[in-house]
């Protein structure tokens, strides 16, 4: 899907334009680098934050098709990009926030998931996602 077929600017340009607003959703001061927009990624995730480098990554291969969805058409693609980026900023500001907290969350989840160690990362991330999305919904 191209910008001309949707009538909107390309996803990389939207992400660049929405990045300051995404950070402002949480705080006027963050130490995050501008998002890295990846045409190719070894990860299947839509987007993620690397707490070691304080950088957000967006998988354009996964994100671009979302621009043609009902959600993008009703809210507008810019708002969808804003929500995606603000969610990732939330991983920095709220949950987990840093590597030490991420490790503590993983330890708690591991103790609750008896004999399911392979699920710890996914469950910990889902818990953080719920906290972030709940907070974003309240804004």
Can you name each region flagged by the protein language model?
Residues 1-138:
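Basic/hydrophobic alpha-helical interface regions
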